[in-house]
Amino acid sequence: METFLFTSESVNEGHPDKLCDQISDAVLDACLTQDPDSKVACETCTKTNMVMVFGEITTKADVDYEQIVRKTCREIGFISDDVGLDADHCKVLVNIEQQSPDIAQGVHGHFTKRPEEIGAGDQGHMFGYATDETPELMPLTHVLATKLGAKLTEVRKNGTCPWLRPDGKTQVTIEYRNEGGAMVPERVHTVLISTQHDETVTNDQIAADLKEHVIKPVIPEKYLDENTIFHLNPSGRFVIGGPHGDAGLTGRKIIIDTYGGWGAHGGGAFSGKDPTKVDRSGAYIVRQAAKSIVAAGLARRCLVQVSYAIGVRGALSIFVDSYGTGSIPDKEILEIIKEHFDFRPGMITINLDLKRGGNGRFQKTAAYGHFGRDDPDFTWETVKPLKWEKAQA
């Protein structure tokens, strides 16, 4: 039986790039909560003792950007210089301007266009992917790497492993079998965890705690065997972390945000962008389309691409690839998708309820992945019934 290895990585919420994603989306949440029509393009960068938010925001909301930055950093666990950043004493720089009037008139006509008339906020192409290898219809490598990162944060915050600090990275390699284009996981080949820690803990204690409290609860026993390789803090020391260890920037973890290297990616980041930015809303609708196709049994794997032009209200192109796993031809799957999903940016916003802020909705997406999450705020994860196709299949 021929097999192959595939690897996905993740970083947890204390990684400096992910810190920036969460701040950018916390700003978006604050704007949308007060003004659902806010136009937001918020970037964040960070380095030792400094966080800067910058970009273009047009909103009626009264937003205290500095307070949002400090609160987000504090909630993640950056409460002293020792752990990489002191939320209450770091410098916070703000350079926010309004959206370009040229973009505003082309996209939403300075708020005069009806939803079905709203154009895309930029050009670009986005991909959605789904696979039947997990209940989430997501790649197992990505699911496990992401859950390991989330578990690291959980055992840090609940005191199970008090030596943990906020920054951390995970990576999982799985041995797969290709079953007619579908991906079948056979075993976990390698688990890699590099986590920030305090000065008191030994490498032996780190390895023992990670195996017992992080790996064991996350990775199903059936995938582990005597040949599984574990690299647990292989560099030997990871005390300096967070923005003290590395600079951070919004939008640098786009593969972690999506499918862990599976499928494809158009290159656009998500965080800090309101739904007129098709980098985000377009990627959400094609995930829903791909997931709905796999959930309906029309394919075991599915990739959907959509493309846009700035100011143009409809999609330029839609593409489908079932990797040979379709129960009907790809051209028929494409027609089903066109029949059931509205790719106009204004209608995506309405159908997925993307103007709704509150409940830390978009900040939640900014750590541990935008897809495969069981949360009612992740409206794009709702499988859409494909009634017409069931009569045809």
UniProtKB/Swiss-Prot annotation:
The keyword Metal-binding appears for this protein: yes
EC class of the enzyme, as a word: transferase
Tissue: Roots and shoots.
EC number: 2.5.1.6
One annotated GO molecular function: metal ion binding
Keywords noted in UniProt: ATP-binding, Cobalt, Cytoplasm, Magnesium, Metal-binding, Nucleotide-binding, One-carbon metabolism, Potassium, Transferase
GO biological process: one-carbon metabolic process; S-adenosylmethionine biosynthetic process
SUPFAM superfamilies per UniProt: S-adenosylmethionine synthetase (SSF55973)
Listed InterPro entries: ADOMET_SYNTHASE_CS, S-AdoMet_synt_C, S-AdoMet_synt_central, S-AdoMet_synt_N, S-AdoMet_synthetase, S-AdoMet_synthetase_sfam
Binding residues annotated for ATP, in chain numbering: 15, 167-169, 235-238, 246, 252-253, 269, 273, 277
Binding positions (L-methionine): 56, 99, 246, 277
UniProt subunit comment: Homotetramer.
PANTHER family the UniProt entry points to: S-ADENOSYLMETHIONINE SYNTHETASE (PTHR11964)
Protein name, entry field: S-adenosylmethionine synthase 2
